[in-house]
Structures are given as structure tokens and as C-alpha cells.
Amino acid sequence: MTGRRSFWGWGLEKDEPTNEQRQETAARLSKRFGREVTAPPVPRIEDVTLRAPRTTPPASLREFTTSETYDRAWHSYGRSFRDVIRAVRGQFDNPPDVVAYPRTEAEVVATLEWCGEANLTAIPYGGGSSVVAGVEPPEGGRPSVSIDLSKLDQVLEIDATSRAARIQAGVLGPALEDQLRPHGFTLRHFPQSFEFSSLGGWIATRSGGHYATNHTHIDDFVESVRMVTPKGVWESRRLPGSGAGPSPDRMILGSEGTLGIITEAWMRIQGRPVFRASAGLTFDSWQAGYEAARHVVQ
């Protein structure tokens, strides 16, 4: 996946709809709903005006931070329908003041320390596919910093014997699979947002995947988690399994970035399938389809 992300919609700028495609869509909608529908122009970053940043990062952080219009607009919203509509209309009323792109865990620590010292809102940002306002700065609040983990995107270690991999949290789904593939492995977690969502985001939101008839949620793959908190770096103990009391990982899974910024995790991986096949089936009723799916799964 190469190219710059669209600041207003899903995908890359190079894949934005052409004028002809937009007009065709408007014509179909007009016919379908019996009223005139016009296609709005594709938003241009040159037309976006944001409020001035309310804070400035210290010199030690400026190498990997920015307050450019594109970066702030892109990190203003997730990708829910409401988010896209506001972005198309150019309604960026509450953008983050600074966007940080830390390249190491130490830079994540330094950024979070600055946020604490300066009383700033820190917002972890993975792939930006949130549909519940998880990456949106709170209204009427303090200056905010969006901490984008996209530079932390590597598979650091593979334990082939135990079938586990140590993976940085900012890696997106396709890049993760690309790095596991040469070793004969796959994570086999494919949420709908797979193309533009990150491992850290999957863990923080307790992601569920499409191919989920066996391992339903990301929970099933997590061996241990490492994250930066306001009190320092925290890491759960990596174990093949444990029955000793509550699992600390369960506290992190689904925490939505409220407890800290996930930087890496040990994940259970699987061997890549030798054969793959797919088929489509039709049923006479919803109930018949439901019953068939239930029998297959059970």
C-alpha cells in the first residue's frame, strides 16, 4: 500500500472517485429516490482552514511532530459516516493541535511526558478507522496531541517453535501479513477495517474479524502487551498459558487508549494454509441461512 491517505474519506488520495464516477453515482441516487441529487466536489486540503495550534512542542520533539494542515485534518476524525460527512463539508472545528509520529518507544515516552507536563490531551492513533469517535479530540477541552504510531510498524521477532511473534503496534493489517508471509505464518485476523487498521488498535478496541468462526476476537491471539503509561512503561508477562488469577492483558484489551499507548505485543500466529477455497450459497430465507451457518460452526 503506497500513497498518501485521504484526509476526508476512506483509502488513499490516488483512489479518490473521479468526477465521472461521482456524477454517475449522483444520477443513480436521483433515479432511486426520485429527487435531484448533486455530487459535492472532492474536498481539497488547500481549501481547509483550521484554528491556530494552541500549543508548541519542545525542541526535543520537533523532529517527529507537526502542525501542518493536512496532518491535523486527517487526525481530526475517524471514519464513521458522521465523520466522513463532516470532513466532506470541511467542518474541522476541533482538530488536534499537534500530530506526533514517534519512531521509537522512547519517543512515545517523551511525547506522553510532554503531554503530562503541559496538561495536554494525548490521543493514541493507529490506523484511524474508529467509528465511535475514539480518535477525535474532546470538545471544549485542553489542547490535544494525536500520537500516530504508524512509524512503529515492524515484526520484531518470530518464535517459530511456540508460534508467536513480537510485533509493533502501529503496523497495519496488510503490512503485518506481508512480514509474516515469508516465514510461513499468518495472524489470520481480518476485521472489516483490515486494510487501514493497526495491531494496537485491534487490541485497544477488542477487534473482531470476518473469518471468526474459530478465533472470534483479537483476545484469542494476545500473549502479552507492552504499553507506555503516564507512570512509565508497563508490560504483561509472556506465558503460554496461566491459571493464576485474573489476566492483566484483559484489562488492556478494549481499554480504548484510556490506560496508555500500546507499543508492541507478543501475538499467537498460525501456519499459512496450503489450500484455500471459497464458495457462495443462497438460501430461501434468512432463517434457513442462519440455521446452516449455525450447523457449520457447531
Locate each region found by the language model:
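N-terminal flexible segment immediately upstream of the FAD-binding catalytic core
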Residues: 1-113, 131-163
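Short, basic and Ser/Thr-rich N-terminal targeting/leader segments
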Residues: 116-118, 125, 197, 221
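Residue-level detector of anion-binding/catalytic polar loops
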Residues: 120-121, 186
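FAD-binding subdomain of flavoenzyme oxidoreductases
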Residues: 153-298
